[in-house]
Amino acid sequence: MAAAILDGRALAAQRRQQLREQVEAIAPAVGRRPGLAVIMVGDNPASAVYVRNKERACEQTGIVSFGKHLPGDSSEAEIRALIEELNQDDRVDGILVQLPLPSHLDAVPLLLAIDPEKDADGLHPLNLGRLLRGEEGLRSCTPAGVMELLAANQIDPAGKKAVVIGRSILVGKPLAMMLLEANATVTIAHSRTPNLPEVCRQADIVVAAVGRPELVGADWIKPGAVVVDVGINRLEDGRLVGDVDYEAASAITSWITPVPGGVGPMTVAMLLHNTVLSYCRRSGQPFLS
């Protein structure tokens, strides 16, 4: 039985439309549209593509994008000064620093410099702490996008065993907290986990987020499990693949995300969601989406 597809592109388009309708409804009362500032340092080609995609998504949603492109040799102090300027700019509701940064820069102090109420990526320690405590806050975009995909397809994690392969602060750790919040029994697996395939075979939900092309084969997956592939890897032949062997896994899973077109579009959708949420909070308007 072929797996059903967790279609991130279609759901992201639906979410963009919902956000656009909300923006159009409240912008006249606020006197402006929401604003998202994207800081890019250097000329990484992949980052440039991601930034263009975000700017295009902003346009489709009615969000004003403020592109801030700095030279690759910019200092931490120069970037912090820009972040502080954006923190004080009332036109800006969300700020993100496009990663990765040039090797001479440390992302952590720059992410700490962002106003937590404008933390569009949901990576500030205050927002991660709110997640840990089960409080409202701006949530990490990729994990939140995964949870949206599950919810939109009536996949309830409650009572299920979930294995998250990967322990990064970007995906693995916050996603484990979100699944736990949804009443799943969660295991975080990683490179030091003994018998990793066997651990995965116990799971009703498997999330792969390690950045290793097609690491997870069909023999790692329990028949009927839900598989979410967060990885995106470019092979030498130019193909984009995830961390899961899609063709093999899709023959035995109940649901699976494609790569591309699964989690990636939802990451951008949640970035827009966080920006509009911040806009509503800062302007005293109800958030409906």
Swiss-Prot record:
One of its GO terms (molecular function) is methenyltetrahydrofolate cyclohydrolase activity. The keyword NAD does not apply. Pathway: One-carbon metabolism; tetrahydrofolate interconversion. Keywords: Amino-acid biosynthesis, Histidine biosynthesis, Hydrolase, Methionine biosynthesis, Multifunctional enzyme, NADP, One-carbon metabolism, Oxidoreductase, Purine biosynthesis. It catalyses: (6R)-5,10-methylene-5,6,7,8-tetrahydrofolate + NADP(+) = (6R)-5,10-methenyltetrahydrofolate + NADPH; (6R)-5,10-methenyltetrahydrofolate + H2O = (6R)-10-formyltetrahydrofolate + H(+). One of its GO terms (biological process) is tetrahydrofolate interconversion. Pfam families: THF_DHG_CYH (PF00763), THF_DHG_CYH_C (PF02882). NADP(+) binds at G166, R167, S168, S191, I232. Homodimer. HAMAP family: THF_DHG_CYH. Belongs to the tetrahydrofolate dehydrogenase/cyclohydrolase family. Catalyzes the oxidation of 5,10-methylenetetrahydrofolate to 5,10-methenyltetrahydrofolate and then the hydrolysis of 5,10-methenyltetrahydrofolate to 10-formyltetrahydrofolate. This is Bifunctional protein FolD. It comes from Synechococcus elongatus (strain ATCC 33912 / PCC 7942 / FACHB-805). The lineage of its organism: Bacteria, Bacillati, Cyanobacteriota, Cyanophyceae, Synechococcales.
